[in-house]
């Protein structure tokens, strides 16, 4: 095995948490290395309108915000490595990370790997992935211009996807397993307006039992009522999955403490260690540890705290 590339501080992930950590770490002269992962920019790269970023009164696009963050980190001489880490050994010092392209070691590690879209888990869903089934309306919505589509879910992501698609598709159906939305009130109100305009329909209290299709792709979905013995088929050309996310923490299992859903557990912060994990020198920031707030601004704030925590930790090593 080639000798690992050693760095004082490595940041895994390139979303708001990772970029903010890089900015603060660079300003502290920690010479941070960011390993971007496969999806540089994180979930915001597939978010159309960011209307709640402080100071951006007109609003801006998700990719636009991430580009600004990247340029900010670049200006401060953050080094970017385009690689995907698939194995981590946090039980040795320095920490060891194995990627697709190289092996790395570091004295301190900030994990900002975020979360990925969750799928229904149906064999038929997997069979039509990329052939009518998608988890990203902003990525694939264009292909359904003038066609009928459905979105499954009831939270912010599902409503945002439905609203976005309502400007492209001929008709959008939102399928939700509950009898009310979990999305923010403002988003829900916007969706109800689309329903009143006839551009969107909502199918309450139903789940998808099967994705229907042929050699060309998706043709519909088979739905079942969650309480009653009723089923129905819905004819659509595309299905967008928006039922939540799973944290990207698989490579850290049995090393770092996690909750039952796989989110990393961080300390309380009462002693200036808000992002510290159970392993000294390893810090967590953003959606990889937060499944409650899950906002760009909170992820960025945690990235800031992780950099400050890492700085204190590295200082303690130098003083030892």
Curated annotation (Swiss-Prot):
Its EC number is 1.8.1.9. Homodimer. It is found in: Cytoplasm. The keyword Flavoprotein applies. This is Thioredoxin reductase. FAD binds at residues 36-43, 287-296. Keywords: Cytoplasm, Disulfide bond, FAD, Flavoprotein, NADP, Oxidoreductase, Redox-active center. One of its GO terms (molecular function) is thioredoxin-disulfide reductase (NADPH) activity. Binds 1 FAD per subunit. NCBIfam families: TRX_reduct (TIGR01292). Its main location: cytoplasm. GO terms for biological process: cell redox homeostasis; removal of superoxide radicals. InterPro entries: FAD/NAD-bd_sf (IPR036188), FAD/NAD-binding_dom (IPR023753), Ferredoxin-NADP_redctase_2 (IPR050097), Pyr_nucl-diS_OxRdtase_2_AS (IPR008255), Thioredox_Rdtase (IPR005982). PROSITE patterns: PYRIDINE_REDOX_2. Its cofactor is FAD. Belongs to the class-II pyridine nucleotide-disulfide oxidoreductase family. It is an enzyme of class 1 (oxidoreductase). GO terms for cellular component: cytoplasm. The active site is a redox-active disulfide bond. Disulfide bonds join 136-139. It catalyses: [thioredoxin]-dithiol + NADP(+) = [thioredoxin]-disulfide + NADPH + H(+).
